[in-house]
Every structure is written in C-alpha cells, then in structure tokens.
Amino acid sequence: MSFLKKSLLLILFLGLVSLSVCKEEKRVSEEENENEENHEEGSEMKRYAFGYPSGEAKKIKRESEEEKEIEENHEEGSEMKRYAFGYPSGEAKKIKRESEEENENEENHEEGSEMKRYAFGYPSGEAKKIKRESEEEKEIEENHEEGSEMKRYAFGYPSGEAKKIKRESEEENENEENHEEGSEMKRYAFGYPSGEAK
C-alpha cells in the first residue's frame, strides 16, 4: 500500500514539474515572439525612415524577379522549339519584317524615280541597263573583230574586208568568163569568127 502511495505521489510530482516546465517554455516562447515582432516593427520603421524596402516590398520584388525568370525560361523554351521545328524566332521575324519594309521602301522609291523619269523624258533604270548592255556587247564584238584582224595580219591570212574584195573579184572574173563563153557560142552558132580566129 505504501508502495502504491509513493508511486502515485511520484507520478503526481513529475506531472506538476512537467506542467510548470511547459508553462515556462510557453512563456519564454511568447516573450521571444513578442520580442521578434517588436524587432520587426522597429526594423520596418527604420527601413521606412531610411528608404529601404520593407519585407513586403522585398517579397513583391522577389516574386517579380521570379516571374521574369519564368518568362525568360518560357521564351528560351519557345525559342528552342522554334529552332527545333524550323520556325523563325521573334528576332528573326523582326529582322525579316525590317528587311521586307526596306525592300518595299526601295521599290516605292524606284517607282517614284521611274515616274519622275517618265514625266521629264529621262530613260528609266531598265532602259539605261538595256542600253548599257547593248553598248557592252557592241564593244566586246568590236574588240573581238580587232583581235581577229590582228591575228589574221600576224599569220598572213586575209582580213574579212580582204576576203570580201577577193570574193567579189573572183565573182567578176567568173561572170566575165561566162560572158565570153556565151559570146563564143553565139559566134560559132551564127558562123562569125571568134576573137581567137580574128
């Protein structure tokens, strides 16, 4: 009986001790929380006084940076997908659009210039180009003929002009011979003496 009594008293004593310890811990914890809150309020007031961002402002800034980072990662992912599937990137689209705008401006400028030329009777760019190409072809042909003429002269061949003169001379001789043969045949047919018999 006394053992049971002692055991109950011991349990009761330990319960009271643990209860007081819990109360003390709770009180200390509450004091720490209060001190921390006071410290935070003081820090907040200091930040406000000296223009530093508050904890809330820091949180907002951090969230904004995280959103920005997520957006950049999304753009990088999209860029990689476009690259993988051969679609132009935002930058490439911008460059292409600028290039198309420049081409369009250039075409409009050329059309305007063409209209001015037409109005004032100047040859167009296309007409100038055709004229220039024609002149270049003519010049090339002349240079080729000069080169051929020099080769003929160097190797003793007659030039195109000399060939033409020679050919005309040969044709005249042939015509003359044919004429003489015809006259000879007429004389013979009508019994006149030929130039040879005369």
Swiss-Prot record:
Cellular component, GO, one term:
extracellular region
UniProt feature, compositional bias: Acidic residues: 100-109, 170-179
Task: Write the signal peptide boundaries.
Answer: 1-20
Provide an example Pfam family for this protein: FSAP_sig_propep
Can you give the propeptide residue ranges? Answer: 21-45, 56-80, 91-115, 126-150, 161-185, 196-198
Task: Please give one Gene Ontology molecular function term for this protein.
Answer: opioid peptide activity
Source taxon at top rank: Eukaryota
Intracellular or extracellular location(s)? Secreted
One biological process term in Gene Ontology: neuropeptide signaling pathway
Query: Where are the compositionally biased (Basic and acidic residues) regions?
Result: 56-65, 126-135
Outline what the protein does: Dermorphin has a very potent opiate-like activity. It has high affinity and selectivity for mu-type opioid receptors.
This chain belongs to the protein called: Dermorphin-2
Q: Which organism is it from?
A: Phyllomedusa sauvagei (Sauvage's leaf frog)
